[in-house]
UniProtKB/Swiss-Prot annotation:
Bias type Gly residues, positions: 25-46
Name assigned to this protein: Probable sucrose-phosphate synthase 1
Reactions catalysed according to its record: beta-D-fructose 6-phosphate + UDP-alpha-D-glucose = sucrose 6(F)-phosphate + UDP + H(+)
EC numbers on record: 2.4.1.14
Gene name, Swiss-Prot/TrEMBL: SPS1
Compositional bias ranges of the Low complexity kind: 48-61
Residue numbers spanned by region Disordered: 25-61
Recorded GO CC terms: Golgi apparatus
Organism: Oryza sativa subsp. japonica (Rice)
Pathway entry: Glycan biosynthesis; sucrose biosynthesis; sucrose from D-fructose 6-phosphate and UDP-alpha-D-glucose: step 1/2
Molecular function (Gene Ontology), one example: sucrose-phosphate synthase activity
Length: 1084
């Protein structure tokens, strides 16, 4: 058609497809074509006859293929508004009485509206990025002012110099980075015997016959982490590598994915022999429904179950490795490395529980994906989040940034353009903080993880590179060889081709919309010289029936088939349905023999592992200019970069390489010459060298705690840090405190504790029954002294009461006492359960208020094995000598305080949070001095309706480099800030790691509402009983702002590990719920 007539052709096709799947407005106006209101652009109005007012928004890639949607996309992407306007004028001018013309006119309005909506979204994206950059600059100025107060003039100038280095050439940047490396990893480290943990949660992970391309979760990341585990296990100094993933016991997938462990390699052979646990292993941890294979977007509510299961395995393995290589001392992970957002979230929690360094690799980032989908204009933000759980994914990435020591990226572009979008990372602020740390100047709790570029590795041992061939022998192998001697996949590919001896253009990826295969087919179909000179080979995963594939993949494949038909590419395009992983090298080899080219036209490619594979087989490359391929092309110098949206540029680049034999040979030789830069040994050496720079934080108490009660006397001289501090206190202040021991009783709750402790110390087995002391205290008195270590070490069950019952003023209500008493009655009603069980109280209140509450209910503190106070900022053991000072007063577990002190600055948090909380709220926020402690900053909240949500506060805190845990508590009357590693849920994991009481043997008693950390306590392997009716309201309304992730992304909607009470608050009802959840959990 001449001029703009072809637009009418599209519109006619739209009308003809009125009955297509998902058809929209009346009159066949077409399904996916509708884009909201039918209002025209510019000065136009809405045609009253238009059905567009009720039309649905364009369908996203997750929906079934719709030809209407396809045609509309063609118009919206490729037509200028003026063209649409001229077409509309023509339709109006030739109007007749037929309904078809009226519908055609209406469709013009609707498509015009879509085009303008797309531009509006682009403008909103630009404004959003601009506003964010402005806010970042303001934060940098504020942070620089805060930090500059501690620097001398010369140091200030040095810091400015650090910022100025942002504009230095790339070469200088790399030189400076490598100069900071420690000595490169070598054979001299073989005595280290390291244990490394990798986590890749989603997809189907196994060592052999990987089903890459089966779904969008089983792609290049799966192959990468498996090969990384194998390669690391072969490095000197690495004893064991565990790759954690989810266990899948579903009939939908192969039985091998349900095996708890799978050996990848037995490890390096250094002549000294290896222990039975050496090597690399896949460890599969169950979480969520055991009989279902879940896509990654559905895994978020079950992450804490995975954490608890992984933690149990790590502790068991640490003991086993200790027996094998460390004379019985625990061998904790050298590093915990999370891959992707979900595994990053898990790694952050595991790292915090074990106090070991964490490393993160993002692979594909949520903020970047959100921006890309928003630019397409097909889905609203709400639809994007519903489909991809994108906001929960972004929060997972932010949490991982909070905890990570090191972030490994594949490319420099990933650092500058992708991680730079996150609240938790700022390139300039990271340099300032690193400069201060080098000079020994306090950063006031501010921290930014270090970003390093380490390109992924590849195993080249099985790569067979074809020898250089002369110009005229492209098809000689096929003429000489019989069909039986050729690899089967060659025959499968060549059966599609009329002339299989032409050069091949190979694309290998999943049929995912972001891989941009359809644009490649268009480029090939519309370039006649390219069609005449080459064949196109599309390896798009494995399929049996397109209708049985996921909707997004099916849509891409259907579009590809329609394009092949449109351009009549039969005989020039091969698209086999099946291939094995072992066939991939043969496909590369075939392409190389035919003097072909490999192309990766993805919209954004985080790295581009297939580009490395292709280069190793001697193939020149054409690749997207967005993402990792830029660095790969610069390193290998073996191809061309293109704009993935420009199909003409794609066709020109392919034609240039295929037609110019000299250029083809040069690119081939360059790729083969430089490919060792991407070998696995080189990758692992750089990786281990970088990891060695992380600060090792293994807690010393793990080495000092005896394994059982009988070992206490043997290790009496190996007192922990707490024992040393006890001795020093007693030596210095015993005389002062001794004079007041016989004074009149005091109303101070601490004095009550002191009196109880004195009775225990003076008691003997003979007079225990006559002493009015708690039952647990009487048990401890049988030895004539307090326990050196908490009774938690010998408990088989722990009942944790974490009911947040507070009045309007934030003080504890009598309902909380009632819950405690009824739980005690319920557990003690079963004599067998009572003998093996202990109790813990977990609250946001400080210790003095907690003790006053217990005193009010006449509950001795020693009835509890542990008190978790201040929102998890302190842990006490009332019946343990280590937690009682010389004056008989309770004091917190000092090892726990050392544990959570990581990246914490009380003064830095106090100043920053006070400034943020007061911003725009006048005097609504005031310090709560009585609730503060060295690891908790507390503020009064006068009006909860005038404060920012936790989401908004976290965003601002992260932008300033502070890493901490914020929560509103006590009926939203307090804002409390505790260290990153502290929280009520993490305190339970600390008790597991410290004293060996498994989280799976804990019972959590909570109300229906609570503090803003309430929902994060509900998930995990512990059993939870929710008591109805005891908490009328909590602080949950301040957790999230609009547009954030939802509660169901954190807490599973249904879980056998959660039970509810019914009716009144009675011990019998609590016991019924406890038995119900125990029975349900045993059937998992």
């Amino acid at each position: 058609m001449a001029g703009n007539e072809w637009i009418n052709g599209y519109l006619e096709a739209i009308l003809d497809s009125g009955g297509a799947a998902g058809g929209g407005g009346g009159g066949g106006g077409g399904g996916g074509g509708g884009g909201g209101g039918g209002g025209g652009g510019g000065g136009g109005g809405v045609d009253p006859r238009s059905p567009a007012a009720g039309a649905a928004s364009p369908r996203g890639p997750h929906m079934n293929f719709n030809p209407t949607h396809y045609f509309v996309e063609e118009v919206v992407k490729g037509v200028d508004e003026s063209d649409l306007h001229r077409t509309w004028i023509k339709v109006v001018a030739t109007r007749n009485a037929r309904e078809r013309s009226t519908r055609l006119e209406n469709m013009c309005w609707r498509i015009w509206h879509l085009a303008r909506k797309k531009k509006q979204l682009e403008l909103e994206g630009i404004l959003r990025i601009s506003a964010r950059r402005k806010e970042q600059e303001q934060v940098r100025r504020e942070t620089s002012e805060d930090l500059a107060e501690d620097l001398f003039e010369g140091e200030k100038a040095d810091t400015v110099g650090e910022l100025a280095q942002q504009d230095t050439p790339m070469k200088k940047k790399f030189q400076r980075n490598f100069s900071e490396l420690t000595v490169s990893w070598s054979d001299e480290n073989k005595e280290k015997k390291l244990y490394i943990v990798l986590i890749s949660l989603h997809g189907l992970v196994r060592g052999d016959n990987m089903e890459l391309g089966r779904d969008s979760d089983t792609g290049g990341q799966v192959k990468y982490v498996v090969e990384l585990a194998r390669a690391l296990a072969m490095m000197p100094g690495v004893y064991r590598v565990d790759l954690f993933t989810r266990q899948v016991s579903s009939p939908e997938v192969d039985w091998s994915y349900g095996e708890p462990t799978e050996m990848l390699t037995s490890g390096s052979t250094d002549g000294e022999g290896s222990g039975e646990s050496a090597g690399a292993y896949i460890v599969r941890i169950p979480c969520g429904p055991r009989d279902k294979y879940l896509r990654k977007e559905a895994l978020w509510p079950y992450l804490q179950e995975f954490v608890d299961g992984a933690l149990a395995h790590i502790l068991n393995m640490s003991k086993a490795l200790g027996e094998q290589v460390s004379n019985g001392k625990l061998v904790l992970p050298y590093v915990i490395h999370g891959h992707y957002a979900d595994a990053g979230d898990v790694a952050a929690l595991l790292s915090g529980a074990l106090n070991v360094p964490m490393v993160l690799t993002g692979h594909s980032l949520g903020r970047n994906k959100l921006e890309q989908i928003m630019k397409q204009g097909r889905m609203s933000k709400e639809e994007i989040d519903s489909t991809y759980k994108i906001m929960r994914r972004i929060e997972g990435e932010e949490l991982a940034l909070d905890a990570a020591e090191l972030v490994i990226t594949s490319t420099r572009q990933e650092i500058d353009e992708q991680w730079g979008l996150y609240d938790g990372f700022d390139v300039k602020l990271e340099k300032v903080l690193r400069a201060r740390a080098r000079r020994g100047v306090s950063c006031h709790g501010r921290f930014m993880p270090r970003m390093v570029v380490i390109p992924p590795g590849m195993d080249f041992s099985s790569v067979v590179v074809p020898e250089d061939t002369s110009d005229g022998d492209d098809g000689k192998d096929f003429e000489i060889a019989s069909p039986r001697s050729l690899p089967p996949i060659w025959a499968e590919v060549m059966r599609f081709l009329t002339n299989p001896h032409k050069p091949m253009i190979l694309a290998l990826s999943r049929p995912d919309p972001k891989k941009n295969i359809t644009t490649l087919v268009k480029a090939f179909g519309e370039c006649r010289p390219l069609r005449e000179l080459a064949n196109l080979i599309l390896i798009m995963g494995n399929r049996d029936d397109i209708d049985e594939m996921s909707a997004g993949n099916a849509s891409v494949l259907t579009t590809v088939l329609k394009l092949i038909d449109k351009y009549d590419l039969y005989g020039s395009v091969a698209f086999p349905k099946h291939h094995k992983q072992s066939d991939v090298p043969e496909i590369y080899r075939l392409t190389g023999k035919m003097k072909g080219v490999f192309i990766n036209p993805a919209l954004v490619e985080p790295f581009g592992l297939t580009l490395i594979e292709a280069a190793a087989h001697g193939l020149p490359i054409v690749a997207t200019k967005n993402g990792g391929p830029v660095d790969i092309k610069n390193a290998l110098n073996n191809g061309l970069l293109v704009d993935p949206h420009d199909q003409h540029a794609i066709a020109d680049a392919l034609l240039k390489l295929v037609a110019d034999k000299n250029l083809w040979q040069e690119c081939r030789k360059n790729g083969l010459r430089n490919i060792q830069l991407y070998s696995w040994p080189e990758h692992c050496r750089t990786y281990l060298t970088r990891i060695a720079g992380c600060r090792i934080r293994n807690p010393r108490w793990l080495m000092d705690t005896p394994a059982d009660a009988a070992a206490e006397e043997e290790e009496a001289l190996e007192d922990s840090l707490m024992d040393v501090q006890d001795l020093s206190l007693r030596l210095s202040i015993d005389g002062e405190r001794g004079s007041s021991m016989n004074d009149a009783p005091s109303s101070d709750p601490q004095d009550s504790v002191q009196r109880i402790m004195n009775k225990i110390k003076r008691s003997s087995p003979a007079d225990t029954d006559g002493a009015k002391i708690p039952a647990e205290a009487a048990a401890t008195a049988t030895s004539g002294a307090m326990n050196k270590y908490p009774l938690l070490r010998r408990r088989r069950r722990l009942f944790v009461i974490a009911v947040d019952c507070y009045g309007d003023d934030g003080s504890a209500s009598k309902r909380m006492l009632q819950v405690i008493q009824e739980v005690f009655r319920a557990v003690r009603s079963d004599s067998q359960m009572s003998r093996i069980s202990g109790f813990a109280l977990s609250t946001a209140m400080p210790l003095p208020e907690t003790l006053k509450l217990l005193q009010l209910g006449k509950i001795p503190p020693t009835d509890f094995d542990a008190l978790i106070c201040g929102s998890g900022s302190e842990v006490y053991y009332p019946s343990t000598a280590q937690c009682v000072d010389a004056g008989g007063r309770l004091r917190p577990d000092q090892d726990y305080l050392l544990h959570i002190n990581h990246r914490w600055s009380h003064d830095g948090a106090k100043q920053t949070i006070a400034k943020l909380a007061h911003d725009g709220s006048g005097t609504n926020v005031e310090p709560d001095v009585e609730s503060c402690n060295p690891h908790c900053v507390s503020f009064f909240i006068k009006d909860p309706n005038k404060v920012r949500t936790i989401d908004e506060m976290r965003e601002r805190v992260r932008m300033r480099g502070l890493r901490c845990h914020l929560m509103y508590c006590r009926n939203a009357t307090r804002l409390q800030v505790v260290p990153l590693l502290a929280s009520r849920s993490q305190a339970l994991r600390y008790l597991f790691v410290r004293w060996g009481l498994s989280v799976g043997n804990m019972y959590l008693i909570v109300g229906e509402h609570g503090d803003t950390d309430h929902e994060e306590m509900l998930s995990g392997l512990h059993k939870t009983v929710i008591i109805r009716g005891v908490t009328e309201k909590g602080s949950e309304q301040l957790v999230r702002s609009s547009g954030s992730y939802q509660r169901e992304d954190v807490v599973p909607s249904e879980s056998p590990l959660i039970a509810f009470t019914k009716g009144d608050l009675k011990a019998d009802e609590i016991m019924r719920a406890l038995k119900e959840v125990t029975k349900a959990a045993s059937g998992m």
